[in-house]
Amino acid sequence: MPSFDIVSEIDMQEVRNAVENATRDLSTRWDFRNVPASFELNEKSQSIKVASESDFQVQQLVDILREKLVKRGIEGGALEIPEEMEHSGKTYSVEAKLKQGIETTLAKQLIKLIKDSKLKVQAQIQGEQVRVTGKARDDLQGVMALIRGGNLGQPFQFTNFRD
């Protein structure tokens, strides 16, 4: 019986490369000359700290970071940026979290979306991934298209496709 897994994973090496590219880009931009601005990747907490002198500059830095992440093959939805910025002294900063893994509530939404589509497939939660099985390969491809089209606020990948 054909099956595949729905996962949400981020390649941390690509994130590291994107942060390095953003830092390199920052050093060549004239609007950030003589401005203490930085990107800091914390791999343990899977977050990126963006800091600068003003909130407008922090927004520009976040846009640069998103652009570099997309160029490295990481979707922009994988970055969760809070609305409120931290302000301490002369520095504004924001701690952007990387979304990785499928939480239980999101997995339940995925399963509900699949069941509401009336396709002849079964979906089950397995840790931080969802396994989808069905009799026809076409039904599984329909589920893939459905998940790509559904805006669930997180990028998904399809792995372990078995026939």
Curated annotation (Swiss-Prot):
InterPro entries the UniProt entry points to: DUF520, UPF0234-like_C, UPF0234_N, YajQ-like_sf
UniProt-recorded Gene Ontology molecular function terms: nucleotide binding
Pfam families registered for this protein in UniProt: DUF520
Keywords assigned by UniProt, alphabetized: Nucleotide-binding
A single Gene Ontology CC term: cytosol
UniProt record similarity statement: Belongs to the YajQ family.
Cited function: Nucleotide-binding protein.
Protein name: Nucleotide-binding protein ECA1137
Organism of origin: Pectobacterium atrosepticum (strain SCRI 1043 / ATCC BAA-672)
